Swiss-Prot record:
Listed name of the protein: DNA-directed RNA polymerase I subunit RPA43
InterPro entries, alphabetized: NA-bd_OB-fold, RNA_pol_Rpb7-like_N_sf, RNAP_I_Rpa43_N, RPA43_OB, Rpb7-like, Rpb7-like_N
Biased composition (Basic and acidic residues): 288-304
Function of the protein: DNA-dependent RNA polymerases catalyze the transcription of DNA into RNA using the four ribonucleoside triphosphates as substrates. Component of RNA polymerase I (Pol I) which synthesizes ribosomal RNA precursors. Besides, RNA polymerase I has intrinsic RNA cleavage activity. Through its association with RRN3 is involved in recruitment of Pol I to rDNA promoters. In vitro, the A13-A43 subcomplex binds single-stranded RNA.
Record-level Gene Ontology MF annotations: DNA-directed RNA polymerase activity
Sequence similarity: Belongs to the eukaryotic RPA43 RNA polymerase subunit family.
Subcellular location: Nucleus, Nucleolus
Gene behind the chain: RPA43
Ranges of biased composition (kind: Low complexity): 182-202
Bias type Acidic residues, positions: 309-326
Sorted UniProt keywords: DNA-directed RNA polymerase, Nucleus, Phosphoprotein, Ribosome biogenesis, Transcription
Organism this protein belongs to: Saccharomyces cerevisiae (strain ATCC 204508 / S288c)
Record's subunit section: Component of the RNA polymerase I (Pol I) complex consisting of 14 subunits: RPA135, RPA190, RPC40, RPA14, RPB5, RPO26, RPA43, RPB8, RPA12, RPB10, RPC19, RPC10, RPA49 and RPA34. The complex is composed of a horseshoe-shaped core containing ten subunits (RPA135, RPA190, RPB5, RPO26, RPB8, RPB10, RPC10, RPA12, RPC19 and RPC40) where RPA135 and RPA190 form the DNA-binding cleft. Outside of the core, RPA14 and RPA43 form the stalk that mediates interactions with transcription initiation factors and newly synthesized RNA. Interacts with RPO26/ABC23 and with the initiation factor RRN3.
Any one annotated GO CC term: RNA polymerase I complex
Keyword Phosphoprotein: yes
């Protein structure tokens, strides 16, 4: 019973520390002005070792315990493990020297596995709220900007965290579709010419379809936003072993002191859902009338050609007469 209480106390203590932990931003690199989120974390592990790795315990520890941690979020170190180095197995013999090649490992009679302590340095990507990061833009829409950090981690900047004086320019999707359809209609006539001129490459319509996007954002100076973009971390989401970052392009002074978000209306703060056609109730009723027309059904007749007459159900009338007679 005391062990259960002790486990509950430890769990509550861990929750309290995690809840009230002070967020500390990572140091800023003076060369590029971004936060250095990659840190070295020395850890000690008590690991098991399979019998097949007794001759080479370092390889066994790496394959069994360290390699599965790489490029995954680890809650104990608070980030994504990028790699490790400096693996050392501690000798169970306290009298042995550190530079000895042979290490004493604990083995019990009930299992063929060995157990030992080891020290290793983990390189962890730990983004914190308030850090300044850079990412390459890979998607732009009216509701957000999607970025890729270090070609591995996703980041998103929502519309509410984009400056008000920025404007999103939509691509004319209908014109691109017309170009594709026109090119497909004329593809039979120009197929041989396109192959000769482009070396067997695809036609213009397919090229337009491959490069079609939702649009792009334009800043206050009218310059399109593309390539690498610098932002501030607003929130870090850890779902399972995957990490995603929410960023903002608005400084704290503009957001708090000047009431930045209050300048947006409630309609602008709502998420944007793009629809090609908005159907109203009147249009729905008209479409239903046109689609649901009366069907011309043939008359059902008996074998001799006479019309079928359905008699009314006389059970109710018989019940009424019987009740009156009673």
């Amino acid at each position: 019973m005391s062990q259960v209480k002790r486990a509950n106390e430890n769990r509550e203590t861990a929750r309290f520390i995690k809840k009230h932990k002070k967020q500390v931003t990572n140091p800023i690199d003076e060369k590029n002005g971004t936060s250095n989120c990659i840190v070295r974390v020395p850890i000690a592990l008590y690991v098991s070792l399979a019998p097949m790795y007794l001759e080479n315990p370092l390889q066994g520890v790496m394959k069994q315990h360290l390699n599965p941690l790489v490029m995954k979020y680890n809650n104990k170190v608070g980030g994504v493990v990028l790699g490790y180095e400096g693996l050392k197995i501690l000798d169970a013999d306290p009298l042995s020297k550190e530079d000895t090649s042979e290490k004493l490992i604990k083995i019990t009679p009930d299992t063929p596995f060995g157990f030992t302590w080891c020290h290793v340095n983990l390189y962890v990507w730990q983004p914190q709220v308030g850090d300044v990061l850079e990412g390459y833009i890979f998607i732009q829409s009216a509701s957000h900007i999607g970025l890729l950090i270090h070609d591995a981690f996703n980041a998103s900047i929502k519309k509410n965290n984009i400056p008000v004086d920025w404007t999103f320019v939509h691509n004319d999707v209908e014109e691109d579709a017309d170009v594709i359809n026109t090119d497909e209609n004329n593809g039979n006539n120009n197929n041989e010419d396109n192959k000769d001129s482009n070396g067997g490459s695809n036609s213009l319509g397919k090229f337009s379809f491959g490069n079609r996007s939702l649009g792009h954002w334009v800043d206050s100076n009218g310059e399109p936003i593309d390539g690498k973009l610098r932002f501030t971390v607003r929130n870090v989401h850890t779902t399972g072993r995957v990490v995603s970052v929410d960023g903002t392009l608005i400084s704290d002074a503009d957001e708090e002191g000047n009431g930045y978000n209050s300048s947006r209306s409630q309609a602008e703060s709502l998420p944007i859902v793009s629809n090609k056609k908005i159907v109203f109730d009147d249009e729905v009723s008209i479409e239903n009338k046109e689609s649901h027309k009366e069907l011309d059904l043939p008359e059902v007749k008996e074998d001799n050609g006479s019309e079928i007459v359905y008699e009314e159900n006389t059970s109710e009338s018989n019940d009424g007469e019987s009740s009156d007679s009673d």
